[in-house]
Amino acid sequence: MPYYAALGLDVGRRRIGVAGCDRLGITVQGLTTIVRRDFASDVAAISAIAKERQVELLVIGLPYSMDGSLGSQAKQTQRFATRLSKALQLPITYVDERLTSFEAEEMIKAVGRSPSRDKGAIDRKAAALILQQWLDEQREPRRFGSTQH
C-alpha cells in the first residue's frame, strides 16, 4: 500500500493540533499546536508546515457524536476542512475522532505530566492519534464480501 506525506489535524475552536508521518507510514509525531485567530492565519500556518513536509493529504479528525451523528462541531469542522482543502489545493480525508482528546489526555497523565498545564500537548497528541488511526486503516485488508458460493 503506498503511503503519502500526510498531516493529521485535530481541529478545535481555539487550537489546531498538527501531526505528521514519514512517507512510509511507520512513525507519527505531534508537530505543533496552532492557536486559532482567523481563517487566513490558520491557512498560513498549516500551509507553511504542508510545504515544508511536502504534504499530499490532510487527515482531519471529525468529532462525531457518540450516537454516530454529525453534531454542530463536526459540521463546523467539515466546513473548515473544505475551505482549507480548497485554499491549500490538497485532498482531505476524515477519521472518526471520538474520544481522541480524552485518550490523549490519559496518555499525558500516564507519563506524569499535567494536561491542564499544556492544552497544546493534548491537541498534538490527539492529532497524532487521528493520523495513526488513518494509517492503521490503510494497512487493514479490504473485505469485499464472501468468496464462498
Swiss-Prot record:
Write down the EC number: 3.1.-.-
Q: Where in the cell is it found?
A: Cytoplasm
Q: Which GO terms describe its molecular function?
A: nuclease activity
Q: Name one GO biological process term.
A: rRNA 5'-end processing
Instruction: Report the top EC class in one word.
Output: hydrolase
Q: Which GO terms describe its cellular component?
A: cytosol
Check the record and name the Pfam families matching this protein: RuvX (PF03652)
- Cited InterPro entries: RNaseH-like_sf (IPR012337), YqgF (IPR005227), YqgF/RNaseH-like_dom (IPR006641), YqgF/RNaseH-like_dom_sf (IPR037027)
What does the record give as the function of this protein?
Answer: Could be a nuclease involved in processing of the 5'-end of pre-16S rRNA.
Q: Which family does it belong to?
A: Belongs to the YqgF nuclease family.
Matching HAMAP family = Nuclease_YqgF
What is the designated name of this protein?
Answer: Putative pre-16S rRNA nuclease
Report the source organism: Synechococcus sp. (strain ATCC 27144 / PCC 6301 / SAUG 1402/1)
